Amino acid sequence: MPCTCTWRNWRQWIRPLVAVIYLVSIVVAVPLCVWELQKLEVGIHTKAWFIAGIFLLLTIPISLWVILQHLVHYTQPELQKPIIRILWMVPIYSLDSWIALKYPGIAIYVDTCRECYEAYVIYNFMGFLTNYLTNRYPNLVLILEAKDQQKHFPPLCCCPPWAMGEVLLFRCKLGVLQYTVVRPFTTIVALICELLGIYDEGNFSFSNAWTYLVIINNMSQLFAMYCLLLFYKVLKEELSPIQPVGKFLCVKLVVFVSFWQAVVIALLVKVGVISEKHTWEWQTVEAVATGLQDFIICIEMFLAAIAHHYTFSYKPYVQEAEEGSCFDSFLAMWDVSDIRDDISEQVRRVGRTVRGHPRKKLFPEDQDQNEHTSLLSSSSQDAISIASSMPPSPMGHYQGFGHTVTPQTTPTTAKISDEILSDTIGEKKEPSDKSVDS
């Protein structure tokens, strides 16, 4: 059924509606907070919670406005879907920390959910980069194979380098994906250990579970960020149109700062800077450390929201002829089928590697040609030169996708690859047919 006139013009009224809803929520929330302050004794804990709430009220509208603008101008789903997921990190972090600051007893549960979303953000940032590259450069593997060999960064510089091409692409994606598996697993283990009374968060001791889980999470997180950095280093030139440095710093700083400041606070507890002499309204020193971490995050997320507003701007995706209903854009934001397919693909590839089966080739080779000769062939060089010489957008859009991507018409990398593959096979058949005729 076609949309009515009201729904067809949803872009005109959705933003004022959201602004009105937010103002109403402010009118309701502020008196409740004031009433809460009058009901309780105003101590350090309550003051910290109230100040954090002010930053929360400043953070959420900035983040939600950028998310809403992406939904209004939802013209390139393969790029904007991971961006929207990344933008949700700031309000989730801020709201989660504010709740944990108010109710320290449930801090372990809400904080672990926040940390799981952290892994989800790193995965989506990698997905954003790969989606852009595979759409603009369907022959990405050939481009990688034509590049000079990239060595590992310190401290892995002694390890043998990953082969340029499909191997490097697969291992970088797998290195990021492993963190999205390790982090939820360690989160579940942390919850179980908390119920058993052996977690002891914030206390560096090899007699509790928290220390071991921190080490595991840290190693997994560092390797995921290392794979992201290596991926960017190799494809720096191809990624330059989307200005990935600012985006990478936003993701990296939020993830690393939140993690390492928790480690620093735990060290302050260990050396006695934060001691039982000053716990204020908190029951234990560990609760003070957790509350301090949550309070700092509420302030940091306000700065992160401003940074995200500029680095993940919606403006490059504004198109003159926009299509799609509000329901399509809103539902697409919650669609996780791409993640399911990606995880299934990586699991199958790891399984084939473990069983010793050969990897599936994205680009078939002739039996009489090896990797070196195929890269030197004219067809490969033409494909690389064509992909590298695509003109930039005169309107500032990210182009090279063949046509404007809308929720109704979304090109897939597989279709583009099939077209290139069929053209290549057709070119190979023509000389053989001529030789037979002669």
Swiss-Prot record:
SMART domains: Solute_trans_a. Residues 358-438 are annotated as: Disordered. It comes from Pongo abelii. Residues 374-390, 404-413 have a biased composition (Low complexity). The modification Phosphoserine is found at residue 422. InterPro entries: Ostalpha/TMEM184C (IPR005178). Residues 425-438 have a biased composition (Basic and acidic residues). Keywords: Membrane, Phosphoprotein, Transmembrane, Transmembrane helix. The keyword Transmembrane applies. Belongs to the TMEM184 family. It is a multi-pass membrane protein. It is found in: Membrane. It comes from the Eukaryota. Coiled coil: none annotated. This is Transmembrane protein 184C. GO terms for cellular component: membrane. Its main location: membrane.
